[in-house]
């Protein structure tokens, strides 16, 4: 039976790692001093030698006599080498460490390949002492030592051969893996005591040793787990480690679409019938004494049918666990630690996530972090707002920022209405300023290549109103309507830039139904005209140009569409605003009774034709329509930057 997966949550391990880190800082020094004391106070044990002591063998090699060295290497390479033999050799090498120069690189490599981790505690302690002595005396071997340690951050491979043919190559399910990993981290800290610059040399090795993303989820989980542990006692590496982990997560994320994941789950459900559902209902016992086979069955409902989604889910769950464990101390959010982690993650977000189109799940690490305190959510929104309104940013970045703003405002249950209103005010005022700048220009026509950020901001506003209109109108309906009327949607919708033509049809349909119901603006006439203009217009039948009046569609995706990863969504669901089907049905009924002049076929399009399978906006994905986006370096007529440090309407508040 396979050993249980390493804590999908870092709980025990981050706790173990944190305690190991703290204990390393408290007891690690005394342990290492004790090892040194043992070394200096106890002479090497008597052992069988071929040609003398290790020191004599090394000195002979310097004189050109290589036979004894070859005998020594052969003995060290013996697969049946015993614990006592290893201890005796290590004691000898520690006493000869000053002679182990670069000339003996091959010998050192053999020593580093010794199977020391699964040996007795005496072997482990002696080997750790040897590593400390070696790197302190011969820093040239620092990289090989670090590389050896990093290679043990994944389960060893077990190869079964029959007739000289490999018939099995899988992870070794060793129950001692946690203890092995603990020893590896202890080794890193011992080496760092002797060579303080170790973290600087370690990071490139961690990048190099990262398993290929198509490796098993267990291999990936173990390696990422150990990387995150390293960030606890090497805080200077945290940002680089998190960037490495998120970069690998992103590669997995963009390689499998939400639709692929859902199709695989549906196919698996059809194959299994009702069996999995029954097991999921009754396997609720969490008793630690449960039989391992039954325990594995209990975990089965969390497994993703798509192999790439399974890897992504395991790793994202690990990252979310890490974020929570770093930020939450004794059950409460530690403001300072969360601030520091936020700074690291927002820089990674800017570098990796914001320029990446159509990632479905990785970005939820920011969503989750921002849920800890309102101040972090507001800081994130203001950060995105600055990206959107800055004309010096590439249009594609500004559009992505708008997508994130709209999706975050719509989906984050922890964002209060006052913050939603503040953001709507900022966005709508910016849209009106943009239109004012276009009134005197020569490019006031519908073209996504020219006005991409404008259309993305429009869509963010429409999307937010669709999700939040009930809250905006709840309580005092009159005041709510007055607020929505003050946004002057009519000017935006009726402008020459014609955002209803560019924005995603699903969003436009819902927005039109809401604004029509409350008589804010009547969109259907414009939508009907836009639908007619989508037809090609033939200018000449005698070799003339064929003119297609439709412009390129907006390259849209909503970053915080529902998470479909089974483990990770347990972190997200409690703080996530789902789309209420009742709202769609209510608007659908209202639309049927009020929209007379639009063609009849559009009635079905409101929830069926243009809205995905779930009949809600939640299904909007990057694959909703073909993309022909052209992104200029900046859009024309952008309003001046509104943000003034210390005077922004959206304050970045980090609450105590």
From Swiss-Prot:
Segments of this protein annotated with the region Interaction with POLR1F: 498-650
GO MF assignments: RNA polymerase binding; RNA polymerase I core promoter sequence-specific DNA binding; RNA polymerase I general transcription initiation factor activity
Look up keyword Nucleus and say if it applies: yes
User: Polar residues composition bias: which ranges?
Assistant: 613-630
SUPFAM superfamilies in the cross-refs:
ARM repeat (SSF48371)
Annotated PANTHER family: RNA POLYMERASE I-SPECIFIC TRANSCRIPTION INITIATION FACTOR RRN3-RELATED (PTHR12790:SF0), TRANSCRIPTION INITIATION FACTOR IA RRN3 (PTHR12790)
Q: Which GO terms describe its biological process?
A: cytoplasm organization; DNA-templated transcription initiation; fibroblast proliferation; homeostasis of number of cells; in utero embryonic development; intrinsic apoptotic signaling pathway by p53 class mediator; negative regulation of intrinsic apoptotic signaling pathway by p53 class mediator; nucleolus organization
PTM remark: Phosphorylated at Thr-198 by MAPK9/JNK2, which abrogates initiation complex formation.
Where is the PTM Phosphoserine found along the chain? 168, 170, 638
Ranges for the region named Disordered are 265-304, 608-641
Subcellular localization, as worded in the UniProt entry: Nucleus, Nucleolus
Main localization, broad class: nucleus
Taxonomy, superkingdom = Eukaryota
Presence of the UniProt keyword Transcription regulation in the record = yes
- Protein name from the UniProt record: RNA polymerase I-specific transcription initiation factor RRN3
Q: What is the lineage of its organism?
A: Eukaryota, Metazoa, Chordata, Craniata, Vertebrata
Q: Which InterPro entries match?
A: ARM-type_fold (IPR016024), RNA_pol_I_trans_ini_fac_RRN3 (IPR007991)
Q: Which family does it belong to?
A: Belongs to the RRN3 family.
Summary of subunit composition and partner proteins: Part of Pol I pre-initiation complex (PIC), in which Pol I core assembles with RRN3 and promoter-bound UTBF and SL1/TIF-IB complex. Interacts with POLR1F, EIF3L, TAF1B and TAF1C.
State the residue spans of region: Interaction with EIF3L. 555-650
The protein's job, in short, is:
Required for efficient transcription initiation by RNA polymerase I. Required for the formation of the competent pre-initiation complex (PIC).
What are the Phosphothreonine sites (modified residues) in this protein? 198
* UniProt keyword terms in alphabetical order: Nucleus, Phosphoprotein, Transcription, Transcription regulation
Bias kind Low complexity: ranges: 631-641
Kindly name one Pfam family recorded for this protein.
RRN3
Q: Which GO terms describe its cellular component?
A: nucleolus
